[in-house]
């Protein structure tokens, strides 16, 4: 952090400590994720897919640190991947059921791209928003938005 922000190490340490003081549940999540990984040898996504971490108990601090970062990140990133895949299947099925000609053509992280017929645009938007926001029920709402354009740049 000190290097990235071009600030003294002591100041970056204060920023990090202040962050975790403000958001203690994040530190608790991180610690718990590492502990679970050390006990089980893996972490899980929201749909129980496993990410095995064979180096989580390594004696090499660099190797272990990499595995610990994966123990923290994999459940979050993997769960996001799980959720978008559920939404994609549901969107595809709705398009089929409703006889739409528009097609899903690309997924990039948390984005979906479609080729949409103009006369189907509003229906496609409604389906996509509904399925993206309701792919799973969480304690916090999933919020989606739609952009449109003749190319990806315009759609953003």
Residue ranges of predicted features:
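Conserved catalytic core of nucleotide polymerization and phosphodiester-bond processing enzymes
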Residues: 2-156
